[in-house]
Amino acid sequence: MTISNYSLLSFLLIGMSFVSCKTQEKNDSMEPIETKVNALENEDWEVDFLDNFESFNTDNWQDQRIWVNNETHCYVPGGAFGTREVSDGSLKLKVVNTGEKRPCDNFDKNGKQHPETQYAAGRIATKNKKEFIKGKWTAKLKLASNGEASMFPAWWLLGAQNNESPVQEPDENICWPLTGSGEIDIFEHHGDHQKDHFTTGAIKSLGECDKGDWWSLRKGFDVTLNEYHEYSVEWEDSDLVYRVDGKEIYRNVGEGDNYPEKMFAILNFAKITDAPMKGEWVMEVDWVKHEFRK
């Protein structure tokens, strides 16, 4: 081998050593980040509430009748008109066109009664049944369609001291959305906007009764609404983390500590505008659970 060939080989060996060192240096610097992520992903959770909807369990849920958001339906108890059904291992909450206008006994927070309506709907809550501080809430659910005008199904949380109907305990005296009556929306579909789309996020309190910022902490995502998905929110340190099928899609950074109170879960299917509908709309829920970190 000539001297020039020896020089070329030495140059190549030195270059390879340099690249190897830099690669090892890069891997060493990344390792703590990867370890931290894996530690969070593998963190154990323990289930302290699970409803698989083999039946409608009144130890877990109660019907709610209230008029909010200028909704055009009437919430009815006991699954009247087929608005709430448990069958084949799942809960079905519905909006039903009954075919004729009927009196409605729902009232808004100012005592105004809902006008007669031909639309009946189901709304249930774990209020005074299953209430938890922080942790993680998840529901596996789907809609019967990809979305229609006026549809407004939701899976969400509300502070346990909320002063809206039904008021059953002395400490239920805090107005929405102040601390104690805060709101976190895990899944909402606004049918007037677009199909196969939902929004998720917290409502930011503006420090007064009935004064909430609906949009600054919320984000919309595409999803196939008529297929089952798992929608969740969890408290991670001071953040609220939103997931679909276990994958993080959104995060309210630093907002978790603004919701320190016990919260209960709500499932409801609303009709939000005067747009006509026929037959029934269905939200099907396979299960609901709450977990806490061990």
What is the predicted function of each stretch?
Residues 17-20:
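C-terminal motif of bacterial Sec signal peptides marking the signal peptidase cleavage site
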